[in-house]
Amino acid sequence: MTPHAAHSRPHPDAHCVFCAHDTLDVVLEETEHFLVIADHAPLAEGHLLIVPRDHFACYGALPQELDDEAHNLRERATRFLTSAYRPPIFFEHGVFRQTVSHAHLHALPLGAASHGFADEVGRIGRPAPSLDALRAWYAEQGHYFYLETERKETGEREALLFPPEMDVYFRVMGTLRDHTAHTAAWVPPALRQMQGGAKMRALAAAWHTYFEDRD
């Protein structure tokens, strides 16, 4: 077994902003093992993160007993974002290109991807129908880039894993921009953070309004 395959519960990291839960700006929801938070440098209004409370390196390191809870939060985020904004994409850098070294899944309401997107990037990605696929890749190869989109033509969701290579990453994300309804603010994080306060507050208000009549 490689070091990547061990799933023992990690200790909090004193230097990790996601471990210091009380310092997070906008927490939308808390469950036993996860937090749903507004991204502090949003690419678009509605950009949120699903973050495990424990300090796992990436979703490929999550133990199976957290799968149902993680899935339920993804479904919850999908329903909310589709209703309040547009269908989301989910992506995770899987240690590769992480700005915080703590697992976090991005949900970004860019809209469904056209058929052309799947045709262009499907050839270089590996299907990832469950978290088991992430765990297998992480145990065997370490870093990865994960992306899940909704097909515009069918409404079905499709998840792919990509090798952690910069040219692949920029090709996939560039193609995604060309095949979704909404163009996110692909600007430097510092500028997004400076402009993000209003978007975070708007997201929090929309989240609580949406769920107050449904929970």
Located regions from the model:
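HIT superfamily nucleotide-processing domains
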Residues: 1-215
